[in-house]
């Protein structure tokens, strides 16, 4: 009997380049493998005992004789290597067409329309690191009130503003204006509010980031759970990624540790259904900033907290741990990488030491959850429940 699934996404913790990585410029990417190599090994006793080191030969991650979990690596079926594409595929959406990207900034007519609708001028309009662009344009923004608009290798329209210049409520309204404007050929995956604070020369981003995503085009396993009166509890940016669709309750988080805290709080509530958590620091704080050392320490810090999650699990709980894409901090550039993702599953209702090999789509996870709760199957993915359940 399984009453609840705790599904944790370690954002960007990929595990080796996909066969088509050459099309994305990502040959040789291996986020967890290269981070481990960089640090001379990673201490991950909890994930190792679930089977992390048994998925693939990773230098510096312990391979145990008899893991107590089930383990695999997954290919991405969709085109793309971003957060939205990865998470959407997990719950049953195959994004055949990659979301639009803007390496040279957004078209002038689009920006002019945005300025007209918001009543504020735009500065920036280029591909940039969020921390660098507020250093470069923050002072001008504070003086003029113009919005800093920028993008990245991802399909994102990001708006940075100082919280004392553009109050949060206004910034979020501006993002909604952008979201409504960016449709059709310009339907970017996410509009992101990027508030910052501080004085010139020492601006820092705050934790009040908010994502305004496209609404998923059709029902996912989240909707199917919700329709059957099961709880879908979203932790971190999960609610934003799905634009709230299929979510019954949600909590936003400040960082990875807060994400684990909120997950544990939901676990204590003992509601039937799904706790779906995204831990974003790996990607946002360390992957994009090429900080391999901090990335590795972050993996180790999560592993310590994983001990608390395992202790809190009831006999009717199942735990899934995975990732949504890669972001190898040892690679040139600061973009996501097109990688396999690791997968670990554990619970008293599951068999031990099951090697599921390499699976063809992230959607297999969502299809398995649909079967666990006996709800309508999703459009894509093959359930592996029979292979792992006792």
From Swiss-Prot:
Known cofactor(s): Mn(2+)
Transmembrane segments: none
Subcellular localization, as worded in the UniProt entry: Cytoplasm
Binding site for Mn(2+) 2: 283, 288, 336
Catalytic activities: 2-deoxy-alpha-D-ribose 1-phosphate = 2-deoxy-D-ribose 5-phosphate; alpha-D-ribose 1-phosphate = D-ribose 5-phosphate
Pfam families (alphabetical): Metalloenzyme (PF01676)
Pathway of action: Carbohydrate degradation; 2-deoxy-D-ribose 1-phosphate degradation; D-glyceraldehyde 3-phosphate and acetaldehyde from 2-deoxy-alpha-D-ribose 1-phosphate: step 1/2
Residue ranges of coiled coil: none
Cofactor comment: Binds 2 manganese ions.
GO cellular component, one term: cytosol
GO biological process terms on file: 2-deoxyribose 1-phosphate catabolic process; 5-phosphoribose 1-diphosphate biosynthetic process; metabolic compound salvage; nucleotide metabolic process
Record: residues binding Mn(2+) 1: 11, 324-325
A GO MF label: magnesium ion binding
Top class in the EC scheme: isomerase
HAMAP family with a match to the protein in the record: Phosphopentomut (MF_00740)
Protein name: Phosphopentomutase
Organism: Clostridium novyi (strain NT)
